[in-house]
Amino acid sequence: MIQLGDICTKASSNIAQKDLQNCDGVYPIYGASGLIKHVNFYQQENPYVAVVKDGAGVGRVMQLPAKSSVIGTMQYILPNIGVSVHYLAYAMEHMNLAKYYTGATIPHIYFKDYCKENLHAHNIDEQYHIAHMLDKIVDLISHRKQQLAKLDELVKARFVEMFGDPVRNPYGWEIRHFEEISTLITDGEHVTPRRVESGIYLLSARNVLNHAIQVDDVDYIDQTEYARIAKRVVPQAGDILISCSGSIGRCCVVPDNFKFQMVRSIALIRFRKQINPVFAEWLITSDDLQRQILQAATQSSQANLFQGRIKKLRGYVPPLKLQDRFADFVVKINRQKLTIQQSLDQLEVLRKSLMQEYFG
């Protein structure tokens, strides 16, 4: 075994993003979120690895090109002679450098701490082979994600084709407030629920994605706590969930046979029978409704969308038979997405397995 510090060195940047305004050029400069702009100078002649050392995203690893730079919140990591920069980037990604952060207000990591990370010693040919194998997996993962995104775009296009743009409403559908076409608009439990290690799902806003519920990082309650919260609301299949605190406006339909409760960062809408839940889900995620949601949000330290504002959201109401036809189309697309997602999940498992094998 060797240590990370045996195969690379650090270098620093003193560039502030605010100083880049009048530096237009052809050389890329990067920050924690990626490319900032192209400027008329560069700091690194050769490809290198960069690590977010301060602030949001601390520990994130990027492989960046020759003749480029990073701003001062990033750390240059320069491979030694005989070390593949591509291999170095994968090795550092596997190390999960965020675990070294210090500082409560602004997290920070130091090279002097993470340079002691252990890894297997590989010669340059082995490094190239490892990077090549991982590249193939990453390319396949990227392709699967693109396939999923294209299927979502296909559904969006079908929605507009069948119902028209929600803003222009070319077919002249009736426009109604949500409170007029629903039997229930509420939110989750306001009193902090008593959580347990396992049991019944307790969802919060982070678990509500667009068109899906994510339970990789979820809390649990027991049956007693569920029964207490259920006196207020019992979620049902076909209800619509909306994230209403922080990152607001994400929306999905409650699936069949899914028992859960929720905290107040989720809103629930139960539409009348004239509204197909799948149609409602895609209406709410349309650009028009997302604009309405942002305009309706209250701003404090984080955005919030309250029940009263949700009731006043407006959308068109096409004939139910047309909504049902759209829902049938979505079901077919979801079958394709499931197959692709299963392949994507397998590729992610393979990638993690190879990373563990190569880097320990």
Task: Provide a role label for each language-model segment.
Residues 1-15, 19-31, 118-132, 143-188, ...:
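Non-catalytic DNA-recognition/assembly elements of restriction-modification systems
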Residues 2, 68-75, 105-125, 244, ...:
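A short glycine-rich beta-alpha junction/loop motif
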Residues 5-46, 62-65, 69-71, 179-192, ...:
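Sequence-specific dsDNA recognition surfaces
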Residues 103, 142, 189-190, 229, ...:
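Short, solvent-exposed loop/turn positions at domain surfaces
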Residues 248-255:
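Short, Lys/Arg- and Gly-enriched loop/turn segments at beta-strand edges
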Residues 278-290, 295-298:
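Glycine- and charge-enriched low-complexity intrinsically disordered segments
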